[in-house]
Structures are given as structure tokens and as C-alpha cells.
Amino acid sequence: MRENYETLVSVGTSELLPLSAFLSPAEAGGATSGESHQDKGQKPHLEHSSQGEQPQQSLHLTALVQLVKEIPEFLFGEVKGTEDYSESGSTSLDGEQTSPEVAVVVEACPPRGLLNSLPESPASHPSLATTPTGSSTSGGPPGDWAHGSPLPAIGTDDKPLSIEKEGVGASRETSIHSTQSLGQSKSYLRQERGSMGTGTLPENSPLQGLINCLKEILVPRPQHRGTAPDLPPSLPGLSVLKQTRAEVEAGSLPCPVKTEAASGDCPLQGLLNCLKEIPKAPDRRPSPSGASDLQLQEDPGKRHSGGMRHLQTPPHPSHEAGSMLATVKVEDGWAQSPPVPASCQLSRQGYSSYSTGDNREVRVPRWGPMTLASRASSSPLEALEACLKGIPPGGSSPLQSLAISWSRSPQLGDAGSQRFELQQQGSHSEEATREPLLPLSLQGYMREGPGVQPCGSQGTPTSFSSASSSDGDLDFRSPRSSQGQRLGKGYLPGNSPLQGLENCLREIPIPRPQAAWPCSSAVNRGLKRTEPRNWTGDREGLRGEASEPPHLRQRPGEVPSRSLHQDSPQTCTSTCHQVTTRPGTWQWPQEETATMPSPLHRLENSLRGILPVRPLRFTCVTGPGPSPSPCSSSSFSSSDGEDLRPEPAFWQSPLQQKDQPPSCKDPVRLCPVSGASPRVNSNSCSAEDRERTEPRDCSSLSAGRAEEKPHPPRREDGAERTRQPGPVTNAEGKGAAAGHPSPAPQLEEKPEPKGTEDSRDLEPGHRPPSAAARTQGKLLSGDPPESPSKSPLPTTVLSKWSPTSLQPPCPCGRSLQQELHNLGTALTDKLDRLAAALAGLTQEVATMKTQMDQLRRHPRSLGPKGQGSWQLALPQRPRWVNRLGHRHLPYWRQKGPTRPRPKILRTQAEGCKTSDRPGLSRGKGSLVPQLPPEASLVESSRPTCSSSQQISSTPGGHTVLTAHPPLEHTACHQNPLSPSVPTSVQVPLVASPATSADTEPPAARVAAISIPNQPKEPDSLLGEALSRDLWGGDHRDPRWGAH
């Protein structure tokens, strides 16, 4: 925290030093008016220096300095001595005990008096530090409000608001200190404020409560210290809140923050004490989740001057009603903020409360970290300023949180949400669900907050100011809301200080926010990352500030929760975009970079750490969750990059780790397209794949997968994997299938070389077919190199292997996936061919129909041979049709009903049986009349369609596809010829089922199996696709029958 404070100081060194120097006299206590003068004199100077010297942090520091400077002004407005004293008391809580009542009396003036009261509040500002919102508010905003100019809407209301804020803070501190004189002063101040037109009863006014608290703090310094611990969150957060409010409301940070800065704790000891107590306050505050905060507010108000309670009540109504988001809301927010002695909560709740009610108040937990930051700073004014700056950071990240909070502060809703998130962390109540990402990105979103800044600047700033002063830590709690806005402006420039503060915040959030955030998001460290993951990640990774926290949260270990939950890389990207530090993104995932100004550095770091993990998460998400994780994770991990490698343990996919680089491309490409298919494939092959090569074996299961496996290695170790496709694939694919290396790669490669290989090669990196390819093999991209080299050689062997290796591991699923992929690629070509074939086939069908009608009669009269063969063909055909393509059944049935046509063709074929063409008779799916079996296979789509191939079985039972002569296929019984056809030809062409089964069981079966599992050759794929579509049915029918 001290480092954070130092960072904050360094961020606003000139401002801080002037404030310190300015406050030092005030702290001396002797120069009440002198301090006031110093405040005033230095106020412009500090303001100038803070704004001029440090435009980045100047927003915070300038606001703080201005507030401090204006505190004397406001106090001077009525009674300089009192003002000086109050500010002096604020500055040196322990030393300055000039009667706070004097300051209160001095502030009797409605506008001036109110502001004077506020300066008095600054005097008791340490008490404000003690009081979550009231003290800080009175310290920071009082002068600011009195200033009025910085807070346009607060003009007249400004002071009342400031008074209210201070009243609230005072109420808190009063409750803490229970000083009746303070209560009286508060009543007086409130009366004056009421006359001033604040519309809040003098007693109920938050300023009055703040004044009372300040008086109590100033008079009983020990009590103040007790108060400080009692309401520690108020000072830092309030100061920050004031800054934010002043900035947001007035459009400039000067007054609000300045007041708080001016009222820096005696030596920030009061503030530090408050901060120390802040963790306690947040602890109890989180329990009530806002209600407790109100109670705290109420209690302090009751025990001190009952005004605080009123303040609490008025702030809330005002807060809710506050039409002037900036001014009135600030007032209300401040008023409300003090009611939450937890203060950070209230101030957050200020704008948050008005937007979400008291729930935000419960965001006290943030004050814990803020408390740490505040404690860290012990200089009187510097410590106060550092607390103001670092209070939000203390809770979230010293300066970063503040900057984020300010940046976020403008977005009322967002700030509220953030506050909600923080509150959620504190109370772990409805807020957690409602805005998990905000808390998670609270810091990250704080970065984003600047984007939302305008929204919250109206009301959030007010509440933020209150929270900043009174709930400095709470400001941290909602650094996005209140801190982000301010820092949103200036924290980027002060990135280096902010980064130091960020580091501090990262450390700070971890100790306490982790406890608080875990409440809401620690449920599932890994899984909770989905929503709270960001929170948890932010706090976990100490990058909680960055919007990246979500991404960081989605660390390798965390990826599963989001990845598994989110099935698509898109979701993962948007949700996991925030890695360990995470987004929101996560949305996406890029929000971390785009919307995390909180600390730019932190954002960068978070992005560095998160981006790799998040893609992995996306990959994981894209992959089938935990079960399919191996397959999808394998390719996704590759696509995600190296970060997923840590996740492999989570994903249970060694292949991920091994194949992360190789899959790098594929997963990205596959994630979107193959999100569902890979899951299906992974699910179907999940068990077996895990057994063999959990991730890669899934690929191996699908013929293309094994090839793809080697190919991804090809990316990684293209040569090595290509050389060792089987072993590498298995080893990479989880090394589970040590015995399957050769078969799996061969099988996969074998089919792939023909059709899948080409298609996958066409889409090595990101083609949609890669979804099927990915399901078949996660490493589609790697397929082409190995597939070509391996597939040709193992085509025959692989076809043999295919039946054995492919069948055991989800042959159907993989075959379907491969076929889908092949059909996607080859189907297009085949469809084109089919279109042409259909054109000719239509004519042929018409002719065939006519002939069929005639031949129906003829075949009937032809005799048992024709009928028997026709009958055989008919039954086999339907079977083949069903086997080949269930989806193609309609086409086949359409043609199936035209069985006479096949009969006609077969009749003609019978006539030409002697001259039967083996390729045609085999009906291997040759689209073109196949004199050679191979040629017929290549042209299978055309002959199949054109001949409306009649499936006839010879007595031997071999199914023969008879092509109509017009189809350029002389329908001939393939039964005898198919055996005669070279085995090599039959294998590639996948001889008719009967032929494959009877004549050449090994080769034909291998070919048939390999084809169903995965078309090996492009022609085979085309034939398969065609058979599935329409024409390939006959060709595929035999294959399917064999399959």
C-alpha cells in the first residue's frame, strides 16, 4: 500500500507536495487562517500544478488539491479561522483539534456556511477518512461544493451536496465519535444548508453529520483515530469520490477531490486508521450488502448526532430522485455515501446507490484493499492525497483503481454496476450475478469505465466523490465506476505511476478483494471465471484492475470453466477475452485491450498474459467442454497458442500442449466452424479418442484426423510429424494410442489423401470444412502435407487399416464427419457434375422410365433371371441407399421407385452382359462410362446419375450397378466382371458390396470401409458424395453395403 501511495504521490507529486506543504501549516494547527490562506493560496497553485503539471493524474490530484485548497476558501467564506482549523484538523486529525464546532459555526452560512461546514468536515476529514464517505466527503467535497464553480449543478446545491456529503461523513464520524456538539454543529450546518437551499434538514444533511464527525475528529483526536478505524473507508474513498464527483459533476476534479485532499488526515494516520478499519467496515458491510452499510450510517448518525441517519435517508431518496446526476446525485450520493460507514460502499453506492440503491453500498469490501492503500500512505496531506488517489487503488489498485473508478464513475449505471459488483463481492448478494463481469473487470472495466464515463459522470461522480472522500476504498471498490472516470482521463498519462499503483492494486485486491470477490466469484475459481471469473481473475492475478482480468481469470486452469461452459470460440473470446486479469470480455475478449485504460500498462500486461490464454479458452470453449476437450482442446490449444498449454491439465489434453503450436491455426479456424461438429465428433470419439489419442485420436478416428494430426505437427514440426505421422500424432494427440500410431495415422491419412486430404488441404487453416475436418482431425491444417505424402502410400494399406483402426474409434461419427466434410468440398464439385449428370440423367430417366415401364413388363416376361436380378438389385439398392446416405434416401427412393428403369438398364445390360464393363457393372459410381474400373470410379458420379444405375446382383450375390446404355454405361453384371476387375481398381473404386464382400473381402472391405469412414480418393469422395446425394447412391451403395 505504501508503494501504491508513493506511486500515487509520484503521479501527482507537485500537487501532493503543494498539498502537503499547504496542509502542513494547517496540521500545525496554529495557522488556521494561515492554513486557510495556504489552502487558498496553494489551492490555485496546487490546482494549477495538479492540472497543469500532471494532466494525467492532475485530474485526481488537481481535484484533491483543489478540494483541499477550496476547503479553506469555503471555510474562509464563513470563518477563515474555523475553516483553517477544520482543514488543519482535517490535515492533522491527531493534532488539529480546534473546536470543530467553530468550524461548523463558521460554516453556518447557507452556501458559505455550508461550505465552511464542509471545510470543517475537512478539518475532521481524517474522521471522514474514518467515516467512509462523510469524512472524506466533508474533507474533499465540502470545499469543492462550497466552491460550487467546479460543480456547476452543485452551485447552490453544490455546497449543500458537499455539506450533505460531509454531513453524511460527519454523521458517520459523529456516530463513530458520538459527539453531540458535532451533532449540534451538524444541525446548525444543516440548518444553514437548509437555508442555503440544499433542501436537506440541517441535522439530516450529510454535511452536518460530516461536520459533527469532523468536530469529533478534531476535538477528540483519539476518538478520531478510533473513528478512523471505525469508518476508515470513508476518507480515502471519499477523497477519491470527491475528486471524481467534482470532476464528473463539475467537469473538473478541482474542488471535490481537493476538499478531501485538503482534509488529509493529520498524518494520514487517521486516514490510515480509517483504512485499517475499512477492511473491518467492508467486512461487516458486505454482510448487510448495503443494508448493513445503511445501518452503519444510521448507527453512527444515531450515536453521533442522529443527523447521520437522516443523512443516510435523505441521500438515498435524493440519490434516487437526484435529477442532477452530477450535482443532486452527488449530493445524494454523498449523503448516501456517508450513511454507509463502510463508506466505500456508500460512496460507491452513492451513484451506484442511486442507480442501484443500497446494494452498491455493500461494495464496502473494496475498501479493504483501499484501506491497505490508505494505510500505506502515512504522510499527512500526501498520505491523504495518496489515499485519495490510491484509495480506489487500495481497494482495486491504488491509482489505477482510482483512475478506473473515476473513469468508470461517470457511467452511472456502469459505476453502479461496478459498485454492485464490488458490493457483490462484499455482500456476495444479487450483485454478483448481476454484474460479475464488472467486478471482474471492475478494474478492467474501470479501464473501460472511461468509455462509460459520461453516463456515470452525472450521478456516479457525485456518489463517486462521496465514495472517493468518504469511501475512498469503496471508490477502489468501484474503481471502474468512480476511479475509472477520473483516471480514465488522467490515469493514462500517469500510466507509470498508475502502473505502480496497479501493481499495488493487484497485490491489494488479491489479499482482500480475493476474499470479497471470491464470495461472488470464488465459487468456481476456474468456472466462476465465466462471470466472477473476471473479478476473481482480477484479484487473483492482481490484474483485477484490467478489463483483462476476465481474460486473465480465464487462465489455463480457468479456461475449462468458461471454455467448457462456452462451446464456441466466439463465446470464449467474448467471455474469455479477459484472461487471468480479464471481459469482459470476458467481451470478448478484446475489451481488455480496447476498454482497459485503467492502467494501460496493466492492460498491456494483462493482454499479454490474457490474450494467449483467452484464445485457448476460446479454443477450449469451442471444443466440446471437458469431455470433448481433448479433441477440441487439442486443436484449440494449438490455435490458442502457448497459453493453453498450461491449461492442458485442465483440459486433460496433452495433445493440446504438444499440438498447441500446430493447432494454432486450425483451432482458430475450427473453433467457429467446428464448434459443434468437433464436439459431436469428440463426443462420439471422446472415449476412444482419449484411449488412443484423446485429442488427436479423435482426429485419427476420422481418417482425416490422423492426417491432420501429422499436419499440425507439420506446422509445429511439419517434417517430424510428417515423418512420424502415427507416433507423433498419437503422442501429440495425447500420446494415448501408442499402439495406434501407425494405424490411426494411416487410416486417417489413407482416406484423406483421396478426398478429405484435398478438401482439407484446401482448407488447411480456416476453411469451414475444417469444422468437419477438425471433428475428424483437429489439426486439419496440418493434413495436407502429410496426407499427400502418406495417403498415397498407405491408401491401400490404410484402406486395410481403415476397417480395423477407423472402425474401432467412432467409425460412424468420423465417417460421417469426414463424409460431411468431403461432401462439403467434393459435393460442390459433385453437385456440379451431378447437375450436368442430372440434366442428362433426367433425359435418361425419362427414357429409362419409358423403357422401365416396358421393361417392367419385359423383365417380368424376361424370366427369373431378369426378375431375380431385378429383385436382388431392388432389395440391395434400398439397403445401399439407406447405408450410403440416409439423407439421400429421398433421391434414391425417387429413383428407387424407378426400379424398372434399372431393370431396363439391366435388361439392356443383360443384353450387354457379355460385354459388360467391369467399371460400370461394378457400379463403383463411375459417372462416366467406365471402360476401366478406375476410370469408372473417377467418373462414378456421372454414370451413377446418368444410368440411374440399376443395382443388380448376379447369382453370386454380387451387386452390380447396371448403367443404361444412354448413360454411356452398358449395364452388365458386375458379378463375374467385378472379381475379374483388378483388385487395385476395385479397392479404389470400392467394388460393389457383393464383389467387395465375396470376391475381394480384404481389399474391397478395406476400400469400402475406408470410403465410408473417410473417402480416400477425390474420385472416391466424389463418388461417395454423389452416391449420397443422388447418383453416387449406386456407387456408394455397394460401398456402403460392403461398409
Curated annotation (Swiss-Prot):
TM stretches of this protein: none
Composition skew (Low complexity), residue ranges = 126-139, 630-639
- InterPro entries reported in the protein's UniProt record: KRBA1, KRBA1_rpt
Q: Which domain of life is it from?
A: Eukaryota
**Record field: compositional bias (Basic and acidic residues):** 36-50, 156-167, 528-551, 687-697, 705-723, 747-766, 1031-1043
Region listing for Disordered, in residue ranges: 26-56, 113-186, 279-321, 413-497, 528-590, 621-816, 910-929, 1010-1043
- Keywords, in A-Z order: Coiled coil, Phosphoprotein
List all Polar residues biased stretches: 172-186, 566-590, 788-805
Q: Which SMART domains does the annotation name?
A: KRBA1
Q: Please tell me whether the keyword ATP-binding is annotated for this protein.
A: no
Q: Which residues carry this modification: Phosphoserine?
A: S99, S181, S252, S352
Q: Which intervals of the chain form a coiled coil?
A: 825-858
What protein am I looking at?
A: Protein KRBA1
Whose protein is this, by species? Mus musculus (Mouse)
Gene name of this polypeptide: Krba1
